[in-house]
C-alpha cells in the first residue's frame, strides 16, 4: 500500500465524522461530533486487549514498531495532518499490523468526544510542538483542559508519558502534570532516555546533537 492509496472519505463542505479503512476521521471546524455513534473500542479492534494511545504520531515509525512488537496491546495513533496519517496507514498495512487504529484529527477533540472514561492504559506524547514564543503558549498541548481529559480517559492506574527534546517545554509540562498525576520518578521527575524507539523526530534531533528527555506520571487512584 502506498500513502496516496488512502483517500479522504468526504468533501470539505460535506465533512463529518467517519470510520473507514481503520481510520477514524475527526474533522476540524465541525460542530456535530455528538451526532456520531461511536462503536465501542472492543468492536473497533475486535477484542478487549488493553489500549495504548500515542499522540503526535508524525509519520508513524514509532507507533507502528510498538504495535508490531506488542500484539497483545491495542494501539491508537492520533495525528492531525492527513499527509502524515497516510504514511502511518501505509506502514501499518505494509508491516501487516492489525492491532493499530488511526485517528486523523485534533487530540483534544478526539479525547473530548470519542474517548469514554477509563478506557486507555497508557498515553504517550512524542515530541509535541513546544510553541516556544510567549504569544503562542495557548496552543501548547499540556494545559488544564488536556490534563482533565487525560485523567478522565486513563484507567487506574494509568500512565502518561512525554518525550521531548525541549527542556523548557518539559519543565512546564511537569509543573502542570504534578497538579493532576503522580510522578513515577524522583525529583526532578525526568531523565534522559536511550533506545526509546525509532521515530523520525528522535532521529532528527539526535542527529543535531540534542538530548532527549523522558518523563512518566501515573493517574492517582480515586482521582476524578
From Swiss-Prot:
GO MF terms, alphabetically ordered: tRNA (guanine(46)-N7)-methyltransferase activity
Q: Which pathway does this polypeptide act in?
A: tRNA modification; N(7)-methylguanine-tRNA biosynthesis
Q: Which residues bind S-adenosyl-L-methionine?
A: 54, 79, 106, 129
> This chain belongs to which protein, by name?
tRNA (guanine-N(7)-)-methyltransferase
- Keywords assigned by UniProt? Methyltransferase, S-adenosyl-L-methionine, Transferase, tRNA processing
Which CDD domains does the record match to this protein?
AdoMet_MTases
EC numbers listed for it are 2.1.1.33
Query: Function, please?
Result: Catalyzes the formation of N(7)-methylguanine at position 46 (m7G46) in tRNA.
Keyword Signal in annotation: no
The enzyme class is transferase
Keyword tRNA processing attached = yes
Listed Pfam families: Methyltransf_4
Entry's family note? Belongs to the class I-like SAM-binding methyltransferase superfamily. TrmB family.
Under catalytic activity, the entry for this protein gives: guanosine(46) in tRNA + S-adenosyl-L-methionine = N(7)-methylguanosine(46) in tRNA + S-adenosyl-L-homocysteine
Supply one GO CC term from the record. Answer: tRNA methyltransferase complex
Coiled-coil intervals: none
Q: Which InterPro entries match?
A: SAM-dependent_MTases_sf, tRNA_(Gua-N-7)_MeTrfase_Trmb, tRNA_methyltr_TrmB_bact
Q: Which PANTHER family match?
A: 3-DEOXY-D-MANNO-OCTULOSONIC-ACID TRANSFERASE/TRNA GUANINE-N 7 - -METHYLTRANSFERASE (PTHR23417), PENTACOTRIPEPTIDE-REPEAT REGION OF PRORP DOMAIN-CONTAINING PROTEIN (PTHR23417:SF14)
Q: Which organism is it from?
A: Chlamydia felis (strain Fe/C-56) (Chlamydophila felis)
Q: Which NCBIfam families match?
A: tRNA (guanosine(46)-N7)-methyltransferase TrmB
Per the Swiss-Prot or TrEMBL record, the active site comprises 129
Residues binding substrate: 133, 165
Q: Which cysteines are joined by disulfide bonds?
A: none
